């Protein structure tokens, strides 16, 4: 062999090390920067228009459910609490993402949402690249535009919620899998493992992709030596370990247990697999007779059942065992439930979580217009046609098919929300792009037979995805209830009542909405209406401690202190962590003259709600009544430190200071009280 030939052979071997050949076909058409920019800008303009419009919805700044939890968590991170407490219950990536943004930009929810829609628009451009690499430039363009105009994607991208990271990380991982940059295999596979690990810290069920990618490493590189495949697998696993093990160590050090992600497997599995389950989250309320089975609630109920304190891992194991017991006892019922959940995953309706897609459609012109046709039902039909028309290439596409099936199964095994299936969307968009382009080609070529088969597949898929099992494609009771809470925080009580009433009209047995109506009517002084809805809430959710406490408050304020105290005590027995129940009990005891007995529940209320001024104020009032002036003054001062605009505390402190002859200070607090009460 000549020296020149030897150099060429060495170069070829080196290139192969840097550029592993895969069974996924390389693009037949070069992707171009202009199309990247066009798709990105189209997606961005649509999402920006949507963002401007939804600022009018009360939920934009008054977050609900997980969004509020993530935001509060992020604020603690931005304030310096980087490690937190206990084993993670919810996946941590998005709260830390938010926390870093809030550390840099402050608590600016509009700007954060804008940055998120930039990521969403980038993901549309990435889908174009992936589609061009897998199929053709035309298919890539179609796939990118499908995602750009897909109404639920526009909705999810602008929420304070982790779906945006699910989308972006999955698209980036697919790009690395396809090796656009011809990266050295060490960098590539460590990157793939790291991105999948990050995706698992946002959407835990995505870790089901780990064995699929590992399998593909071994069977998808047919032209590479067997010896090189373990090295690739090792790099992939190293990337996973690099991301997940530090989280596990953090959980071990802070929470006492080594968990690679979170400790919510058991409760989540039970929510989706129990005798009352119907495939959605809300069904578990019928079983536990409470509002939710989350974090502290899951722990409290498990500890009550076991009779001792439990670690997060033990709590998860308890609920997992409860679900498995149900499956063993009623296997036929569980299989029917599993089939129902599988169909719900593919149903056209976006099953609502804290934020209801269909309520946002009422505020957003892009969602209103695009929602008529650019929804999951259309996407699934287009993707089914694309899968059929691309089936001849199944050997090089099997990983993508397997990812779709695995992600869908990982949702169905638990329970279904629209956002839980969102990671399916970019994968389906790829095949939707193929379906559009190939169907157009067949039409131009007048290839009627394959077009007829494609039409049959479209119709069959449409029947399945539009089967009436997920409810109407309209706002749900939970969405209206959360809207009512947001209106209430804005001080718009009438609008809040109207929204909560709509929730009850949609779902008369929705106890949470009855509870909120009770609170709203009590706020307006409409006692009989409040009594009626509190009663209905407690009939539906007798173990709801907050409802017991607030109904007791209504009774106590109406003069029936004895009945009120019974409800306060029941609330505490159900959930001793409800500070309001302790506060209400302490106030009621004080009103009956049982001052000494009132101190303990008021102190407990202050301990449970350290940011609340009311428990400290009432303690000060009791100390003052007992002539313990020093303790009373300290309590009133502390209450005002917590809440400077608390007029009753200013007035009580003024009276106390006057009794002690401190007339100048008393006058200042008296004047401040008058100013605040005007």
For every predicted segment, state its role.
Residues 3, 40, 122-149, 167-168, ...:
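Transmembrane-helix signature of polytopic, membrane-embedded enzymes
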Residues 33, 326, 333-400:
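Membrane-interface anchor segments at the N-terminal boundary of transmembrane helices
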Residues 54-68, 76-113, 326:
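Membrane-proximal lumenal/periplasmic loop motifs of glycosylation machinery
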Residues 114-135, 172, 176, 381-385:
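Transmembrane-helix motifs of polytopic, lipid-linked glycan transferases
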């Amino acid at each position: 062999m000549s020296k020149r030939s030897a150099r060429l052979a060495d170069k070829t071997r080196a290139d192969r090390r840097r550029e592993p050949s895969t069974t996924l076909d390389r693009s037949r058409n070069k992707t171009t920067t202009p199309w990247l920019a066009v798709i990105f800008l189209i997606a961005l303009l649509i999402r920006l228009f949507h963002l401007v419009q939804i600022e009018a919805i009360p939920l934009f700044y008054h977050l609900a459910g997980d969004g509020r939890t993530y935001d509060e968590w992020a604020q603690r991170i931005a304030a310096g609490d980087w490690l937190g407490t206990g084993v993670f219950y919810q996946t941590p990536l998005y709260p830390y993402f938010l926390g870093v943004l809030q550390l840099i930009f402050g608590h600016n929810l509009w700007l954060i949402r804008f940055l998120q829609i930039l990521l969403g628009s980038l993901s549309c451009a990435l889908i174009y690249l992936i589609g061009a690499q897998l199929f053709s430039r035309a298919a890539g363009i179609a796939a990118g535009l499908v995602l750009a105009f897909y109404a639920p994607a526009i909705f999810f991208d602008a929420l304070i919620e982790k779906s945006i990271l699910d989308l972006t990380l999955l698209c980036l991982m697919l790009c690395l899998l396809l090796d656009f940059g011809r990266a050295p295999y060490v960098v590539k596979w460590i990157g793939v493992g790291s991105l999948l690990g990050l995706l698992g810290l946002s959407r835990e069920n995505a870790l089901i992709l780990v064995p699929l990618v590992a399998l593909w490493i071994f069977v998808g590189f047919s032209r590479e030596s067997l010896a090189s495949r373990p090295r690739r697998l090792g790099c992939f696993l190293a990337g996973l370990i690099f991301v997940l093990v530090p989280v596990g160590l953090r959980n071990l050090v802070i929470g006492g247990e080594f968990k690679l992600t979170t400790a919510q497997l058991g409760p989540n599995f039970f929510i989706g697999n129990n005798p009352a389950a119907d495939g959605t989250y809300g069904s578990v309320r019928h079983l536990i007779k409470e509002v939710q089975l989350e974090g502290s609630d899951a722990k409290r109920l498990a500890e009550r059942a076991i009779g001792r304190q439990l670690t997060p891992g033990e709590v998860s194991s308890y609920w997992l065992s409860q679900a498995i017991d149900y499956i063993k006892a009623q296997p036929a019922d569980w299989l029917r439930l599993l089939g129902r959940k599988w169909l719900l995953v593919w149903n056209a309706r976006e099953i609502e979580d804290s934020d209801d897609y269909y309520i946002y459609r009422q505020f957003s012109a892009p969602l209103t217009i695009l929602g008529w046709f650019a929804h999951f039902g259309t996407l699934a039909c287009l993707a089914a046609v694309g899968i059929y028309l691309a089936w001849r290439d199944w050997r090089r596409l099997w990983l993508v098919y397997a990812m779709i099936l695995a992600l869908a199964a990982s949702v169905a095994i638990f329970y279904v929300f629209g956002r839980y299936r969102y990671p399916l969307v970019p994968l389906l968009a790829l095949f939707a792009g193929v379906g559009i382009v190939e169907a157009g080609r067949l039409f131009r070529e007048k290839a009627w037979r394959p077009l007829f088969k494609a039409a049959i597949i479209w119709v069959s898929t449409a029947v399945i995805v539009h089967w009436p099992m997920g409810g109407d494609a309209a706002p749900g009771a939970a969405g209206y209830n959360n809207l009512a809470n947001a209106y209430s925080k804005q001080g718009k009580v009438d609008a809040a009542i109207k929204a909560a009433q709509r929730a009850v009209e949609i779902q008369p047995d929705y106890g949470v909405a009855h509870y909120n109506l009770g609170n709203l009517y009590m706020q307006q002084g409409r006692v009989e209406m409040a009594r009626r809805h509190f009663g209905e809430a407690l009939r539906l959710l007798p173990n709801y401690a907050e409802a017991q406490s607030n109904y007791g408050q209504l009774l106590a304020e109406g003069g029936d202190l004895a009945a009120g105290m019974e409800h306060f005590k029941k609330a505490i027995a159900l959930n001793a962590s409800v500070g309001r129940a302790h506060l209400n009990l302490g106030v009621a005891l004080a009103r009956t003259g049982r001052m000494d007995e009132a101190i303990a529940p008021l102190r407990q209320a202050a301990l449970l709600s350290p940011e609340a001024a009311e428990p400290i104020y009432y303690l000060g009032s009791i100390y003052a009544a007992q002539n313990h002036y020093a303790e009373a003054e300290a309590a009133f001062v502390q209450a005002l430190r917590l809440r400077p605009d608390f007029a009753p505390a200013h007035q009580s402190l003024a009276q106390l200071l006057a009794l002690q002859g401190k007339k100048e200070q008393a006058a200042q607090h008296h004047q401040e009280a008058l100013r605040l009460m005007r």
